[in-house]
Swiss-Prot record:
Coiled coil: none annotated. Belongs to the peptidase M18 family. This is Probable M18 family aminopeptidase 2. One of its GO terms (molecular function) is aminopeptidase activity. It comes from Streptomyces coelicolor (strain ATCC BAA-471 / A3(2) / M145). Gene3D superfamilies: Aminopeptidase i, Domain 2, Zn peptidases. Zn(2+) binds at H86, H157, H408. The lineage of its organism: Bacteria, Bacillati, Actinomycetota, Actinomycetes, Kitasatosporales.
Length: 432
C-alpha cells in the first residue's frame, strides 16, 4: 500500500484503512472511538453525571462523536479549540419496506441521500452496511463488504442519444439496485438476510438505518502514486485527520492553554438539522457540561465560549484540468498543495480576516503551505457546518479543508500528501 513521497505516507496509508472500515457514519464514529480508546480516551454517557477529571473523553450519539481532552489544572473558563467535521456522505439508503422487484429480478427499494453524482453509482459493485435496531432496544452494526447490489445502466442500444444528450435518470424508476433473481416477496427478504449476516435470530431486527457503499478499496493512483482514489473522502478525510490530531495532542503531555475538541457530526449533506447534526444541541451541550463539571458557572461558560475557535474542516474543490473555467480565475487550489482556506463574503463559509490569521499561524508553526479557495462569481457556493457552528454557538469559526476532485462521486480523488499536511495543521492549531 505504501507509496514513495517527499512526505511520510504512513498517515495516508492509515486513512485508507479508516475509509475501508467506515462505510457508514455509525462505523466511522466507532472507528474514531477505537483509535481514541487506544490513546487513553474513555467514553462518557450523556445520561450519567460528569466528573471534574482531567484526560481524554468522548460522547457517541448515533453517527456523531464529540471528543475532548482536559489538561491537568484546566480552569472552568478555559477556552476550547475545536476541529469540526462530518461523518456522512451521499449515497443510496434503504427504505422502510426494502423488498421490491420486477420481471423476475429481486431489487432493494432505496432513497437518495444528499446530492450524489448518480452516474458514479451505476454499474458499480455495491455492499450494504449500517445499523440494525433490535427488539431488546440495543443496536448492532452490520457491513456486507462484498458485491451484493448493482444499479445496472441501460445499454446504449436502447438509449442511442445518451452520449449526445447526456444521461437522464428518473430518481424513482432508474436507481433501484438488483441483488438477484426470483420473486421480490418470496425470495427477497433483505432483513432476514442481514439477520443471518449479523448472527441474529429471525425477527430480532425491528428497525434499520442501511446504506450502500462501493466495495472497491481505496488505492494509490498515478505514475508516482501521488494520488489516492477512494470513497467517502468528503468528509471522512477530515474526521480521520481530526482524530489523529486530537490523539497526538493528548499524548504530547504539553501544557495546553486550550481544551482541544473533535466534533464530527452526522447529516451535514442534508442540512445538519438533527440531534446528531451540527445544527443540533450536541456540541453546545458537551461544551457546557464540561465547563459545569469543572465547577463552572454560566459566567465561566460565557468566558470559555468567547475565547473558543473552531476549524470547520471539510473537503473543497481542486482546480479541474478539464473544467478550469468553473473556478475563480485567481484562485486555483492544487492537489498536494497543502490544505485550503475557504472564503465567501456571503457567509456560505465562516472565515473572516481574523480567522485567516489563526489558520495561517497554525500552518506556519507546522511549516506547511496552505491555499485559498473562493468560488467563481457566476456559480453558487456550497456551504459547510462552519456558518452553523458560528451562528448557533457564537464561536469564532474558520472554514478549511483539503482540495479534491469528483466530490460526491462514489469514488473521489485526493492528493496522497494533503491528508498528512492537514493533520499537521490541525495539531498545530490544537496545540498552539
Amino acid at each position: 500500500m505504501s507509496a514513495p513521497s517527499r512526505f511520510d505516507r504512513g498517515h495516508t496509508d492509515d486513512l485508507m484503512t479508516f475509509l475501508s472500515a467506515s462505510p457508514t457514519p455509525y462505523h466511522a464514529v466507532a472507528s474514531a472511538a477505537a483509535r481514541l480508546e487506544k490513546a487513553g480516551f474513555r467514553q462518557v454517557a450523556e445520561t450519567d453525571a460528569w466528573e471534574a477529571t482531567s484526560g481524554g473523553k468522548y460522547v457517541l450519539r448515533g453517527g456523531a462523536i464529540v471528543a475532548w481532552y482536559v489538561p491537568e489544572g484546566a480552569a472552568a473558563h478555559t477556552p476550547f479549540r475545536i476541529v469540526g467535521a462530518h461523518t456522512d456522505s451521499p449515497n443510496l439508503r434503504v427504505k422502510p419496506r426494502p423488498d421490491t422487484g420486477a420481471h423476475g429480478w429481486r431489487q432493494v427499494a432505496v432513497e437518495i441521500y444528499g446530492g450524489p453524482l448518480m452516474n458514479s453509482w451505476l454499474d458499480r459493485d455495491l455492499g450494504l452496511a449500517g445499523r440494525l435496531s433490535l427488539r431488546d432496544g440495543s443496536t448492532r452494526l452490520v457491513d456486507v463488504d462484498r458485491p451484493l447490489l448493482r444499479v445496472p445502466q441501460l445499454a446504449i442500444h436502447m438509449d442511442r442519444n445518451v452520449s449526445t444528450e447526456g444521461l437522464k435518470l428518473d430518481k424513482q424508476r432508474h436507481l433501484q439496485p438488483v441483488w438477484g433473481l426470483g420473486d421480490s416477496v418470496r425470495d427477497g427478504d433483505l432483513i432476514a438476510f442481514l439477520e443471518d449476516e449479523a448472527g441474529l435470530a429471525r425477527g430480532e431486527v425491528t428497525g434499520w438505518d442501511l446504506m450502500t457503499h462501493s466495495v472497491e478499496p481505496p488505492a494509490y493512483l498515478g505514475r508516482d502514486r501521488e494520488l489516492v482514489a477512494g470513497p467517502r473522502m468528503d468528509n471522512l478525510l477530515s474526521v480521520h485527520a481530526g482524530t489523529a490530531a486530537l490523539a497526538s495532542v493528548a499524548a504530547s503531555g504539553a501544557d495546553l492553554p486550550y481544551i482541544p475538541v473533535l466534533a464530527a457530526f452526522d447529516h451535514e449533506e442534508t442540512g445538519s438539522q438533527s440531534d446528531t447534526g451540527a445544527d443540533g444541541p450536541l456540541l453546545g451541550g458537551v461544551l457546557e457540561r464540561s465547563v459545569f463539571a469543572r465547577g463552572g458557572s454560566y459566567e465561566d461558560r460565557a468566558r470559555a465560549f468567547a475565547g473558543t475557535v473552531c476549524l470547520s474542516s471539510d473537503t473543497g474543490h481542486a482546480v479541474h484540468p478539464n473544467y478550469a473555467e468553473r473556478h475563480d480565475p485567481t484562485h486555483h487550489p492544487r492537489i498536494n498543495g497543502g490544505p485550503i482556506l475557504k472564503v465567501n463574503v456571503n457567509n456560505r463559509y465562516a472565515t473572516d480576516g481574523s480567522g485567516r490569521a489563526v489558520f495561517a499561524a497554525a500552518c506556519e508553526k507546522a511549516d506547511i503551505p496552505f491555499q485559498t479557495f473562493v468560488s467563481n462569481n457566476s456559480m453558487p457556493c456550497g456551504t459547510t457546518i462552519g456558518p452553523i457552528t458560528a451562528a448557533r454557538h457564537g464561536i469564532s469559526t474558520v472554514d478549511i479543508g483539503v482540495a479534491i476532485l469528483s466530490m460526491h462521486s462514489a469514488r473521489e480523488l485526493c492528493g496522497a500528501d494533503d491528508p498528512h499536511l492537514l493533520a499537521n495543521a490541525l495539531v498545530a492549531f490544537l496545540q498552539p
